[in-house]
């Protein structure tokens, strides 16, 4: 679908996240960030590379390739990145903090994988990107052809060099960090299940009194509060529910702002496509959609959807599991309700909202 000129043109878009890496020598690298322009590409050295993030935003078809990685839970997905480089182009020897699957889409690229890295790994000084020279003993040294896939674990050193004009697509994974979870715990306290009783967190802490200076907050008092704080978190069922909500909100959030169309979907048109044209409803993989159980809760792009009804929750749950839903399934689902026709009308309205928000698509 994509060719090199497509990526160069896409990288110059106003709302695109891209980087242009120019290699003037082994010790002279320059990086240019979005927004990129024609002038940036008019003055490139022999070796250079451009990387575009969040391709799901710009290609629905490419985003659906995530379904080929069904063994990866949706909450671990980050985004799809593409790297274009002419012969000799590279981003240097480096490592990443996340796992990645590389898919060669066009041309050929030579990949070398070497030693494991960590926070003590030394990088080349005075460079705008984290690169190094020493990869240790190579464990892989292969040329990837179109259609080949290479898995690179987090913190494994790697080095990719274009053999000719080539495009490599990176399906990146990620795990949450504690700072993001802490932030979402606070959000969960502000937006929690109204049936959840949080009164236990409003009780004053019990501290042993001791003689101390009037203005001093003693370290032993702070440590005593910390001990009670951690003990309460470990034993509280209410906090378990909040923590589940916080984690789900964290891992369902998108790293990049989601762009949506101004067009409004029409329920009658959606019904016609599904019922008469045998269309199927699918998740748009530009959206992060997932659920937790006990009880069933749906999350989309970092938000808990606390207002969806039982029918909508079932549809979104199945979509998040990569199911394609046809009219027969939707019809059977609403036929089990007291008022099937009204329920279907409400569901079609919701599907239109999901289409407008970029959560789902119809094929």
Label each residue range with its predicted role.
Residues 154-157, 283-285:
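Glycine-rich, charged/polar anion/phosphate-binding loops
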Residues 1-44, 74, 217-220, 224, ...:
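Fe(II)/2-oxoglutarate oxygenase catalytic core
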Residues 188-249:
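Long, charge-rich alpha-helical interaction segments
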Residues 67, 105-106, 187, 227, ...:
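A broad, structural surface signal
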Residues 1-148, 156-209:
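Active-site region of the double-stranded beta-helix
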Residues 234-320, 352, 363:
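Acidic, low-complexity/disordered tracts enriched in E/D and polar residues
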Residues 304-363:
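Long, charge-rich, low-complexity alpha-helical segments
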């Amino acid at each position: 679908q994509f060719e090199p000129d497509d990526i160069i043109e896409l990288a110059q878009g106003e709302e695109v996240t891209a980087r242009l890496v120019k290699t003037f020598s082994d010790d002279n690298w320059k990086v240019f960030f979005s927004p990129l322009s024609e002038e940036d590409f008019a003055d490139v050295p022999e070796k250079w590379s451009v990387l575009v993030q969040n391709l799901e935003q710009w290609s629905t078809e490419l985003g659906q390739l995530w379904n080929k990685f069904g063994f990866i839970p949706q909450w671990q997905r980050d985004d799809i990145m593409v790297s274009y480089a002419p012969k000799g182009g590279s981003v240097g020897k480096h490592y990443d903090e996340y796992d990645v699957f590389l898919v060669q889409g066009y041309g050929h690229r030579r990949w070398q994988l070497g030693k494991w890295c960590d926070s003590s790994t030394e990088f080349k000084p005075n460079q705008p990107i984290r690169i190094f020279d020493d990869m240790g003993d190579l464990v892989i040294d292969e040329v990837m052809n179109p259609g080949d896939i290479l898995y690179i674990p987090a913190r494994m050193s790697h080095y990719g060099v274009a053999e000719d004009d080539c495009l490599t697509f990176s399906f990146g994974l990620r795990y949450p960090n504690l700072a993001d979870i802490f932030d979402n715990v606070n959000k969960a306290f502000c937006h929690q299940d109204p049936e959840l009783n949080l009164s236990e967190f409003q009780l004053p802490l019990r501290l042993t009194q001791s003689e101390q200076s009037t203005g001093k907050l003693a370290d032993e008092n702070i440590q005593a509060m910390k001990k009670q704080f951690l003990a309460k978190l470990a034993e509280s069922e209410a906090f378990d529910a909040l923590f589940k909500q916080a984690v789900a909100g964290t891992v369902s959030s998108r790293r990049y702002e989601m762009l949506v169309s101004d067009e409004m979907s029409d329920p009658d048109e959606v019904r016609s496509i599904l019922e008469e044209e045998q269309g199927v409803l699918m998740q748009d993989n530009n959206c992060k959609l997932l659920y937790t159980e006990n009880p069933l809760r749906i999350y989309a792009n970092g938000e808990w959807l606390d207002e969806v009804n039982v029918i909508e929750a079932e549809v979104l749950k199945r979509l998040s599991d990569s199911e394609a839903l046809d009219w027969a399934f939707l019809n059977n689902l609403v036929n089990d309700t007291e008022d099937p026709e009204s329920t279907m009308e409400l569901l079609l309205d919701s599907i239109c909202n999901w289409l407008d928000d970029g959560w789902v698509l119809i094929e």
